[in-house]
Amino acid sequence: MRLILLGPPGAGKGTQAAFVTQHFAIPQISTGDMLRAAVKQGTPLGQEAKKVMDAGGLVSDEIIIGLVQDRLKQPDCANGYLFDGFPRTIPQADALKSAGVALDYVVEIEVPEDDIIERMSGRRVHPASGRSYHVRFNPPKQEGLDDVTGEPLVQRDDDREDTVRNRLAVYQKQTRPLVDYYASWAQAGDGKAPKYRKISGVGAVDDIKARLFQALAS
């Protein structure tokens, strides 16, 4: 099982990815993790990436694809893999295609923007323990206070509504076009094209999981 999960930030991709990797016994491949590992191991690509990052630059798609190809040669990828947060752009998807990286499915988890803003901007955390709450879905017993210590809860900068809206805007501009890219490739009837499936990411976690596994069986 070789797949990509697409969807906006806050769509629940991380939660669903964990179910998929466990079920199919495949690794979740994150470009961030790969970059850190390559830099730490001092591989040729890692050294190249480190130079760019130390200079405050963005690591090129060429280096990223090289890292992906190296990673896919490792034995734990024999049964497949799940790409996490990659590809993010059309040039990356093109490079992946040109490199002959095989894919069985591309699944889009669709969640309306208003739902995502409510999900993310409603999160509150207790910094010392990491306990998390949600003002609507999992509220503390006393508004704004941790259940255990009674200490104030905070909203992380990442969860502020303006930050969430900015992240969604970046997704719409950069990553959303991938949905059309993979959907049209699948429709073109190319035998190498992955199957494209869209599921709703709204509802209970187990319901979304059931939809996802149904999509991967069709």
UniProtKB/Swiss-Prot annotation:
EC number: 2.7.4.3
Ranges for region NMP: 30-59
Alphabetical keyword list: ATP-binding, Cytoplasm, Kinase, Nucleotide biosynthesis, Nucleotide-binding, Transferase
Residues bound to AMP: 31, 36, 57-59, 85-88, 92, 156, 167
Any one GO molecular-function label of the UniProt entry: ATP binding
GO BP term, example: AMP salvage
Cross-referenced SUPFAM superfamilies: P-loop containing nucleoside triphosphate hydrolases
Pathway the protein contributes to: Purine metabolism; AMP biosynthesis via salvage pathway; AMP from ADP: step 1/1
Localization in the cell: Cytoplasm
Principal EC category: transferase
Principal subcellular localization: cytoplasm
Recorded GO CC terms: cytoplasm
Annotated residues for binding of ATP: 10-15, 123, 132-133, 203
Annotated PROSITE patterns: ADENYLATE_KINASE
Known function: Catalyzes the reversible transfer of the terminal phosphate group between ATP and AMP. Plays an important role in cellular energy homeostasis and in adenine nucleotide metabolism.
PANTHER family named in the record: NUCLEOTIDE KINASE
UniProt comment concerning the protein's domains: Consists of three domains, a large central CORE domain and two small peripheral domains, NMPbind and LID, which undergo movements during catalysis. The LID domain closes over the site of phosphoryl transfer upon ATP binding. Assembling and dissambling the active center during each catalytic cycle provides an effective means to prevent ATP hydrolysis.
Family (UniProt): Belongs to the adenylate kinase family.
NCBIfam families to which the protein is assigned, alphabetical: adk (TIGR01351), PRK00279.1-1 (NF001379), PRK00279.1-2 (NF001380), PRK00279.1-3 (NF001381), PRK14527.1 (NF011100)
Subunit structure: Monomer.
Family matches, as HAMAP family: Adenylate_kinase_Adk
The protein, known as: Adenylate kinase
UniProt source species: Bordetella petrii (strain ATCC BAA-461 / DSM 12804 / CCUG 43448)
Gene field: adk
